[in-house]
């Protein structure tokens, strides 16, 4: 079992019960899923680009991503309906905890010019979204094997009722928010 999952059960959950006065452990916010999304607009012109993006995403997430396709045709972007334009992975359970551990302990400290995560990235319902500009911050990506630096979106979906509970939950996992 992942260290962060044990930490959640042993320290984070009891702290949240004390802080917010929950009467049942089922009321305590928890992380439900983590979604990784990578938009690959260049895949329209070159099919190889999508293969590289899928390889990178598989290495980072530890599971095969789903290819996302365009819902509408957009002439300005030279995109037709059904064209592959990105990929995404939804992590739950054990893989989610392992990814979260790698994100907090290894990947975030490797971000260049990092000054803390923005508190404004909460959505009002306790979920947190962040963008990563380079996939090379993850240790699974070999620097000499990448064709292009790509970013991705990381969304952490929680069962928190509001941003305050969501922030307290993520701070329990040592997320480095700006003060």
Swiss-Prot record:
Single GO MF descriptor: structural constituent of ribosome
Cross-referenced Pfam families: Ribosomal_L5, Ribosomal_L5_C
Biological process, per Gene Ontology: translation
Keyword Transport found: no
Gene3D superfamilies in UniProt: 3.30.1440.10
GO terms under cellular component: ribonucleoprotein complex; ribosome
Key words of the record: Ribonucleoprotein, Ribosomal protein, RNA-binding, rRNA-binding, tRNA-binding
Source organism, top-level taxon: Bacteria
PANTHER family for this protein: 60S RIBOSOMAL PROTEIN L11-RELATED
Function: This is one of the proteins that bind and probably mediate the attachment of the 5S RNA into the large ribosomal subunit, where it forms part of the central protuberance. In the 70S ribosome it contacts protein S13 of the 30S subunit (bridge B1b), connecting the 2 subunits; this bridge is implicated in subunit movement. Contacts the P site tRNA; the 5S rRNA and some of its associated proteins might help stabilize positioning of ribosome-bound tRNAs.
Subunit structure as annotated in this protein's UniProt entry: Part of the 50S ribosomal subunit; part of the 5S rRNA/L5/L18/L25 subcomplex. Contacts the 5S rRNA and the P site tRNA. Forms a bridge to the 30S subunit in the 70S ribosome.
Family: Belongs to the universal ribosomal protein uL5 family.
Stated name of the protein: Large ribosomal subunit protein uL5
Organism name: Shewanella halifaxensis (strain HAW-EB4)
UniProt lineage: Bacteria, Pseudomonadati, Pseudomonadota, Gammaproteobacteria, Alteromonadales
């Amino acid at each position: 079992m992942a260290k962060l999952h044990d930490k959640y059960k042993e320290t984070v959950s009891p702290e949240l019960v004390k802080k917010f006065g929950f009467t049942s452990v089922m009321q305590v916010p928890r992380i439900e899923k983590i979604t990784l999304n990578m938009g690959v607009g260049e895949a329209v012109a070159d099919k190889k680009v999508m293969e590289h993006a899928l390889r990178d995403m598989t290495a980072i997430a530890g599971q095969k991503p789903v290819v996302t396709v365009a819902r509408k045709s957009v002439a300005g972007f030279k995109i037709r309906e059904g064209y592959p334009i990105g990929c995404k992975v939804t992590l739950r359970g054990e893989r989610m905890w392992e990814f979260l551990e790698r994100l907090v302990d290894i990947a975030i400290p490797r971000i260049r010019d990092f000054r803390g995560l923005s508190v404004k990235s909460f959505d009002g319902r306790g979920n947190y979204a962040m963008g990563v500009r380079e996939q090379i911050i993850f240790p699974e990506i070999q620097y000499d094997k990448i064709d292009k630096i790509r970013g991705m979106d990381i969304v952490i979906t929680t069962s928190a009722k509001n941003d305050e509970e969501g922030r307290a939950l993520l701070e329990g996992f040592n997320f480095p928010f700006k003060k």
